Regions:
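Extracellular glycan-interacting surfaces
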Residues: 1-377
Length: 377
């Protein structure tokens, strides 16, 4: 029977959920990293340092390597990894993910940790907006110079959460190709292994711009982007205002918000077992930022955003005013797909049937910032 490990990063530490019965019941452990803000958690299913056969990190490991990007407001920001499913954590060297002196900047937060497709490759999106890449399984990282030196940099402005790269999506088949998203700045894509980056936000709305300039080439406040399971050129973006779809890898985007109760939100997910299935978490905005009508509903589209349906089974439908942050939702590799999300009021919900029903697996935690699941067996 499949086991699942759920990483739950919060404003004040890391909690770990464990299920040994195909996600029917859960135990919650923590806090780990107490009083550290864990804005990013990640899973590399290829494994890491647990190998004993001489293979390097990232080479088809038996146990997934888990990651946490944490910020201690006294000691700074760091990346940790675990090769025993979160029972213990190892910090990388202090200078393993640091800005070069020439930038005049220091690392504020790690917002995204995700594996690439090359052996040992791990990507990190950080604040201020930059991308770091590791080739040794996430032990050491190197800043991408081309993005840091991009001529658009002086136009990128901080959103409410800071000026950061929060999404890194390596292409599943092409090691030279990756798409990133930042707030604010929009989406950028490299097709030459990071030697150059081109804006890929045409068609995404920037409501905060004056009339006549609401559809710029770059500069949008994109909140999150997800890639389709079957078509790598099909991506979905939850924007500061609106939900958008591209069928050409980001060259052009179209609105898919008709049918949703609100256009604001933070996360967007795709189902790895159902191509064309996308999920969002709408909020009324810009002033309130509450779930519409005080009811927690996940909205799912089975047809790439052409139509939408609310998912409510097991979720509170009255007096619910807590938001789901951009990285506080994820899917797993189970069958059927598991869907997980945590709220700013510290409650975590899980579905083991692709979103048809949810159960509460944790409550009364600090506000949840990041969630990732590792499936075993």
């Amino acid at each position: 029977m499949a086991e699942t490990v759920l990483l739950i990063g919060t404003r004040k530490g890391l909690w770990i959920g464990r299920s040994a019965d195909d996600r029917k019941s859960w135990s919650i452990e923590g806090p780990q990293l107490p009083m550290e803000e864990v804005a990013a958690v990640g899973v590399d299913p290829r494994g890491g340092g647990n190998r004993t056969d001489g293979a390097q990190p990232g080479h088809d490991g038996v146990t997934p390597r888990l990651f946490a990007g944490s910020t201690n407001f006294a000691y700074g920001t760091r990346v940790l990894h675990s090769d025993d499913l979160g029972h213990s954590w190892q910090g990388v060297p202090e200078d393993a993910i640091r800005f070069p002196e020439r930038t005049g900047n220091s690392l504020n937060r790690v917002w995204q940790i995700t594996p690439g497709i090359q052996p040992g490759e791990v990507w990190a999106g950080v604040e201020p907006s930059a991308v770091f890449r590791s080739t040794d399984g996430g032990v050491t990282f190197t800043m991408n110079d081309a993005l840091w030196d991009h001529p658009h940099r002086e136009t990128w402005e901080p959103g409410f959460g800071g000026q950061a790269v929060h999404t890194v999506l390596p292409h599943p088949d092409d090691p030279e190709d990756a798409l990133i998203a930042m707030s604010t700045g929009g989406c950028y894509r490299t097709t030459d292994g990071g030697r150059s980056w081109a804006p890929r936000s045409t068609g995404i709305r920037a409501d905060f711009n004056p009339e006549g300039k609401k559809y710029p080439e770059f500069g949008q406040c994109v909140h999150k982007v997800a890639r389709d399971a079957a078509d790598p050129d099909l991506l979905f973006a939850q924007n500061h205002g609106g939900v958008f779809r591209t069928k050409d890898g980001g060259a052009h985007w179209d609105s898919i918000e008709p049918g949703l109760p609100a256009t604001f939100g933070f996360p967007v997910l795709t189902d790895p077992r159902k191509p064309g299935t996308v999920l969002v978490f709408p909020l009324v905005a810009d002033v309130e930022r509450f779930p519409p009508d005080g009811a927690m509903k996940v909205w799912r589209s089975p047809d790439s955003g052409d139509t939408w349906e609310p998912l409510t089974a097991g979720l509170p439908q009255d007096g619910m005013y807590s938001a789901v942050m951009r990285d506080a939702a994820c899917v797993d590799a189970g069958d059927p797909t598991g869907i997980y999300f945590g709220t700013r009021s510290g409650t975590v919900y899980a579905s083991r049937d692709g979103g048809d029903s949810f159960t509460e697996v944790a409550a009364n935690l600090p506000d949840v910032l990041s969630v990732r699941a590792a499936t075993l067996g």
